[in-house]
Amino acid sequence: MIIVSVMDKRVKALVENPSLTSVKGLDALETRKIVEMLTAIRVMTNPLQLTAIPSWKAHELKPRFPGKWSLTVTRNYRLTFFVDVKAQEVSVLDYEDYH
């Protein structure tokens, strides 16, 4: 899928340059996990494919936010994004503590 919009500047840096090993404001483990997740997002054709990795706890945030998905990066922080399966696009990609 194509990532069309990114809200968090740290994640945007990783989207633009996936070979980065460090980003200001993220520790090495967070950086590595986010890069892995971004790679999976790019190659997926359906967000249900992300559920193949149980530690990411991939799930849609419905009924409150239909179409918005969440992946667990750390105990409190999630990579969240909207998916348009027909257009094969991911938008409003963010790194947030929504709890």
Predicted segments, located by residue:
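Arg/Lys-rich, positively charged N-terminal/basic patches that mediate binding to nucleic acids
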Residues: 1-38
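Generic, well-ordered alpha-helical segments
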Residues: 3, 26-33, 53, 65, ...
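Amphipathic alpha-helical interface surfaces
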Residues: 7, 30, 34-37, 57, ...
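Generic amphipathic, hydrophobic interface segment in small proteins and small subunits
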Residues: 31-51
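A short, surface-exposed loop/turn module that caps and links secondary-structure elements
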Residues: 45-69
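Enriched for short, Lys/Arg-rich terminal
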Residues: 59-62, 68-99
